[in-house]
Regions:
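Short, flexible micro-motifs
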Residues: 8-11, 196, 214
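Active-site cavity-forming subdomains of large catalytic enzyme subunits
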Residues: 1-107
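Small-residue-enriched alpha-helical segments and adjacent helix-cap loops
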Residues: 14-15, 208, 215-216
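Accessory "access/gating" subregions that flank catalytic or transport cores
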Residues: 90-212
Length: 216
């Protein structure tokens, strides 16, 4: 029941949408039950598909798109949590907030980096531990402390890129062929998952980098 994502998500979507027409099975309250039984229990009738609707249900990117949305929600939580973890590390290390100053990041204005630097300043505002760094003879903090905006920020950039692509895909038509009008149908490749797949790979690397710098 796997899929390659190169011709829609035919296998998983076929299983997923069978219950809509009264076929297949539902996972209902930890039990696997026939779809017809569950529909009847809830006074629901199976959908009567019309021309091309069955193909539209299974020959698209809905499966990879659903996983992308779930992944984005988890990534957003991970990004925010990583900033908090980073700020706690700075406090525990009695580090300096100088690497998070606005002036430093306006001259290399990546959106993600600026966002993280702003968050770090806010999280560490009035920190008594950090204030103890003032007058310290140590010239610079370790890379993993100083480079939090750059590393976390790069991961945020990847997240933002994937988020933009996902918004486009959520509002797109991805089945095939496409009926343009009563007299015109176009066979194309909107079912191909590459626009999301490539960005997902890239964002997976970005997520793992959050763990790498935290481990340092």
């Amino acid at each position: 029941q796997g899929s390659v994502g190169a011709s829609g998500e035919l296998a998983p979507l076929s299983h997923l949408f069978l219950p809509l027409i009264g076929e297949g099975e539902f996972r209902f309250k930890k039990n696997i039950l026939p779809a017809k039984k569950v529909l009847k229990k809830h006074d629901l009738l199976p959908i009567q598909l019309r021309a091309k609707e069955g193909l539209a249900l299974i020959n698209g990117t809905q499966f990879i798109l659903a996983h992308t949305v779930i992944g984005l929600n988890k990534m957003k939580y991970l990004l925010d949590l990583s900033d908090v973890s980073g700020a706690m590390s700075v406090e525990g290390f009695q580090g300096s907030t100088a690497p998070y100053k606005k002036a430093l990041h306006t001259i290399r204005p990546f959106k993600g980096t600026i966002k993280v630097a702003n968050r770090m300043r806010g999280l560490l505002k009035n920190s008594q531990n950090v204030l103890s760094h003032q007058g310290c003879g140590r010239v610079q903090d370790p890379y993993s402390i100083r480079c939090i905006p750059q590393v976390h920020g790069a991961s945020r950039n990847a997240y933002q890129h994937l988020n933009e692509l996902t918004e486009i895909e959520l509002n797109s038509v991805t089945d095939n062929p496409i009926i343009i009008s009563k007299d015109e149908a176009i066979s194309g490749g909107n079912f191909h998952g590459q626009p999301l797949a490539m960005a997902l790979d890239y964002t997976s690397i970005a997520a793992s980098e959050l763990g790498n710098i935290s481990d340092r």
